[in-house]
Amino acid sequence: MIRLTFLGTAAARPTVGRNVSGIAVQREGDLFLFDCGEGTQRQMMRYQSGFGVQAIFVTHTHADHVLGITGLLRTMALQGREDGLTIYGPRGSTRTLDAIVRLGEDRVGFPVEIVECRAGEGHRADEYRIVAFDVQHGTSAVGWALVEDDRLGRFDIGLAHEMGIPEGPMFGQLHRGEDVEVDGRVIQASELVGEARPGRTVVYSGDTRPCAQTVECARSADVLVHEATFGAEEEERARYTGHSTASDAARVALEAGAGELLLTHLSARYSDDTRGLEEEARSIFPSTRVARDGMSVEVPLRSGDMAELAEPSS
């Protein structure tokens, strides 16, 4: 199970209805944050995303993406946390991130590691990885992609029974691609196991202009979370501030062949009424939604549509 919970969807500053950037990402039993703007920990409480965060993936060190880290670390310490936490950021981010961590150093009793990442680097787990990719924001900035490993192909249990293979460890060996011997016969795994099935991919752009790197990283992604700070009427402003319009984000999703586009990082002018942004994007890429604080989206295995799990509480 992969679940995204939007903790903050506003650009630059919070509004009454939207906090600044933060997304809780749950992959099975693992929990991460993509960005951590001010007030993120309160949003985590409000939307019950959990505090067992293993790592924070920072896209860049602008205030609306990192100022929530200090308070979050203090709260974790007050809760008795002992496990270490890793903060991943782009090149050149260590000095700022270290200063943010040190603001709460007297209250943090667990290890915090800061890791700078180039494109292609990041966190590796048994069945997935979270890697950085370069974006265009006029400063050192990256996006992040959660990429699952391919899953094993389907195992034909019926055929295995017909071939006289006893249930038990041999089934597992064959499913893992290992040939086995039964009554003097060598059974090849390829006879019983189908082709590997692709894992899921979730891509988060962070703040950026539309760029080829995001398109490439989001190629056939299940979900692309892309910033849409402005509408098309502010295209010039988006260009000189290093941001994207809803149309820009939609064109990226279309070129990448993404499954669904979720728009975030909205200017305060759109906070209360996002219909224009959504219509603008959908005219190019129909499978688009504007994210809102508290929206929880599950990304299923590639056999069905995403389902919205929870409405934000009022």
Feature map (PLM): residue ranges:
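Conserved beta-strand hairpin/beta-sheet module of binuclear metal-dependent hydrolase folds
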Residues: 1-49, 144-146, 153, 194-205, ...
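Metal-dependent catalytic neighborhoods of phosphoester/phosphodiester hydrolases
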Residues: 68-76, 100, 271-280
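Active-site metal-binding motif and surrounding structural segment of the metallo-beta-lactamase
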Residues: 38-88, 116
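Active-site neighborhood of divalent metal-dependent phosphoester bond hydrolases
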Residues: 81-116, 269
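Active-site neighborhood of phospho(di)ester-bond hydrolases with catalytic His/Asp-centered motifs
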Residues: 34-37, 54-61, 90, 203-208, ...
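Metal-dependent phosphodiesterase/nuclease catalytic metal-binding core
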Residues: 24, 118-263, 271-284, 300-314
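Structural recognition of alpha->loop->beta junctions
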Residues: 111, 277-294
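General small-molecule cofactor/ligand-binding pocket signal
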Residues: 5, 88, 113-117, 131-133, ...
